[in-house]
Swiss-Prot record:
Xref: InterPro entries: Rhabdo_matrix (IPR005060)
Entry membrane topology: Peripheral membrane protein
One GO CC annotation: membrane
Function: Plays a major role in assembly and budding of virion. Completely covers the ribonucleoprotein coil and keep it in condensed bullet-shaped form. Inhibits viral transcription and stimulates replication.
The family this protein is said to belong to: Belongs to the novirhabdovirus matrix protein family.
Pfam families: Rhabdo_matrix (PF03397)
Keyword annotations from UniProtKB, A to Z: Apoptosis, Host membrane, Membrane, Viral envelope protein, Viral matrix protein, Virion
Complex formation: Homomultimer. Interacts with nucleoprotein and with the cytoplasmic domain of glycoprotein.
Protein name listed in UniProt: Matrix protein
Gene Ontology MF annotations: structural constituent of virion
Main location (coarse class): virion
Keyword Metal-binding recorded: no
Compartments reported by the entry: Virion membrane; Host endomembrane system
């Protein structure tokens, strides 16, 4: 009896944004504000993602919050066009580069089992980075919407593409190395 080999079939798994039904709920994060980075200007996507992760983690208290990835997407996207100024730091007597970015209307979508409805008024958030700091001053709106509404499906697809990019993997590794031991390790595998 001859042994017949069947060709292997490739099983294609469609992206998540195509398998969601129109009535599935997503968490929509919107923000308006000003992002100020002192001490450095991010030059590539990996640096932008790393700085955005650091700031989003400081705002949300860690990276396990469902709004973490949308905020990273909003902040890294806002770091495209900014105004840089050199100012003298009186403590160290060195010139520091201060770059300001405007977040006109940042919006991103994330899948969440329990989307929340919350408005956070204008506040200022600051976190330290090597040779400087990142400050975001702005307001947030967290809302639950259906996937089929407005442009949520395309926003979800763009976010998924960014999360699967090699730049995001490099930024995640650098971000994981910068965290103190014992914090937020359960969410990263």
């Amino acid at each position: 009896m001859p042994f017949i080999r069947r060709p292997k079939r490739a099983i294609l798994i469609p992206p998540l944004h195509l398998t969601l039904k129109d009535d599935d709920k997503v968490l929509v994060v919107e923000t308006v504000g000003t992002l100020i980075i002192s001490g450095m200007t991010p030059s590539n996507l990996t640096e932008k993602l790393g700085l955005a992760m650091k700031l989003a983690s400081a705002i949300l208290g860690g990276d396990s919050h469902p709004a973490f990835n949308p905020l990273v997407e909003i902040f890294s996207g806002a770091m495209e066009f900014g105004a840089s100024v050199e100012k003298l730091d009186f403590m160290t007597r060195e010139n520091k580069v201060i770059t300001t970015y405007k977040v006109a209307r940042g919006k991103a979508v994330a899948l969440s089992n329990f989307p929340m409805e919350k408005r956070v008024g204008e506040k200022s958030y600051t976190t330290q980075i090597r040779n400087g700091s990142i400050t975001y001053t702005g307001s947030f709106l967290f809302s639950a919407e259906h996937v089929g509404l407005k442009d949520n499906r395309s926003l979800f697809a763009a976010g998924e593409g960014l999360r699967e990019s090699p730049d995001m993997a490099q930024a995640r590794e650098a971000f994981a190395g910068s965290l103190p031991k014992g914090k937020n390790e359960s969410s990263r595998k």
